[in-house]
Amino acid sequence: MSKNQEKYSQLRSIIPEMRRVKHIYFVGIGGAGMGGIAEVLVNEGYKLSGSDIAENAVTQRLASLGAKIHIGHREEQVHGADVVVVSTAISADNPELLEAQALRIPVVQRAEMLAELMRYRHGVAVAGTHGKTTTTSLIASVYGQAERDPTFVIGGLLNSAGTNARLGHSRYLIAEADESDASFLHLQPMVSVVTNIEADHMDTYEGDFEKLKSTFIDFLHNLPFYGVAVMCIDDPVVRELLPKVGRKIVTYGFSEDADVQALNFVQEAYLSRFTLRRAGVEDMEVVVNLPGQHNVLNALAAIAVATEDEIDDAAIIQALADFQGIGRRFEQLGCFDTNKGEMVLVDDYGHHPSEVAATIKAAKAGWPEKRLVMVYQPHRYSRTRDLYDDFVEVLSQVDCLLLLDVYAAGESPVPGADSRALCRSIRQRGQLDPIFVSDSEQLLSLLPDVLQAGDLVLTQGAGNIGAIAKQLSLSSLGFDLAASGTGKE
């Protein structure tokens, strides 16, 4: 028996297999959340297949691991499956879903399958409107540095691992908990993190913010009585909920009453430095290889979780300093020398006004001498409508703004909640003259005339703007360019 097989055998003695399940089929397998769970399952030894409308990096990776991937949804493809996994993005008339129901094959949500993976493990679930992916990644990195060998399922690419999911050989499972469809209520972790709570995905909660808050309380009460809730006390809504949580609480933040507190924050380009204060131990100096106060909060959450699990401080400090980032989370795609001077290209997934504001703040703090050029793609008409005034306020804070049309994500257009309307409203404020861009081709043709020496170019949004950012290669900009570095200053 090989060393890996021996580890797998030991894991099986801790984590029982799902009874009678051998073949698992994923409808929409190419999504980050679905693909991450699928990767863990295929590595656990299950026969795995699934479908999506197009090939992508996730489907290619799963195919390389032995999964059978179908492009397109056809009813016969679910034949032989013992269970079918779907996400809330799959419509009720999907032919594979209908066939599974007709054949009485069990159909479960993505979160139910994640809950099954977590059921026999020491689960750490990270919830919140913003910061889930980064916080989950930091926790996974700390546990990896401490040789706890965790399983993790993350909504973004963890650069150090080259994947967003990994099967470890220990009892630990670290995962994001999705509040967008309330599916995080399926999870029963040992540790729950709440980073912040804002009005987002309000259709799920019938437009009722109180219902959203009470759902977070229900999520925290899924913890066993011996579990731990790790909560950001800097967030006013989270602070408001603290008295309603009937579990052990560990708070974190910049606030003086935080159990895990950051002081003396300084940002130096991509790095964040701060003093860590916890009761009963000496203060420590910490360096996080991520920019911005919002990422210090994410690091504090990881520190709080690790401290509760008695992970050595040396491992925590090393993991945070060595952190290699996550795909599309303030990801520097390069520092380039052009015939107009050096420019920095950064790509970020944030698509809520608070997330965009945090990214802008980090960019200005780390590179105060640079002109900030943002290429923003709004995500969903409903979000643009519901947070319209906030978007106008936040997007007005950059030096130059190019607005791509809304990435619909399956929604129908909403009059007055599109990028042309945003352009008009921002222009009326008199601070900025934004440029509406109809598509990526027009963007690539416009940029050479817009950019100046020393610019920091920030592509921002949750749609296909990430793919567009990759297109902003040396030749695409129409300059005589040569890469000058790896991206980090």
From Swiss-Prot:
Q: What GO molecular function terms would the record report?
A: ATP binding; UDP-N-acetylmuramate-L-alanine ligase activity
EC? 6.3.2.8
Organism's domain of life? Bacteria
Q: Which Pfam families match?
A: Mur_ligase, Mur_ligase_C, Mur_ligase_M
Reactions catalysed, semicolon-separated, are: UDP-N-acetyl-alpha-D-muramate + L-alanine + ATP = UDP-N-acetyl-alpha-D-muramoyl-L-alanine + ADP + phosphate + H(+)
SUPFAM superfamilies, per database record: MurCD N-terminal domain, MurD-like peptide ligases, catalytic domain, MurD-like peptide ligases, peptide-binding domain
Q: Give the pathway listed in the UniProt entry for this protein.
A: Cell wall biogenesis; peptidoglycan biosynthesis
Q: Which UniProt key words apply to this protein?
A: ATP-binding, Cell cycle, Cell division, Cell shape, Cell wall biogenesis/degradation, Cytoplasm, Ligase, Nucleotide-binding, Peptidoglycan synthesis
Q: Which GO terms describe its cellular component?
A: cytoplasm
From its record, what is one biological process in GO terms?
Answer: peptidoglycan biosynthetic process
* Signal peptide start-end: none
Q: Where in the cell is it found?
A: Cytoplasm
If you read the UniProt record, what top EC class would you report for this enzyme, in one word?
Answer: ligase
Query: What does the entry list as the binding residues for ATP?
Result: G128, T129, H130, G131, K132, T133, T134
Q: What does this protein do?
A: Cell wall formation.
> What's this protein's family per the entry?
Belongs to the MurCDEF family.
NCBIfam families with a match to the protein in the record = murC
Q: What is this protein called?
A: UDP-N-acetylmuramate--L-alanine ligase
- State the organism of origin: Shewanella sediminis (strain HAW-EB3)
Instruction: Give the gene symbol.
Output: murC
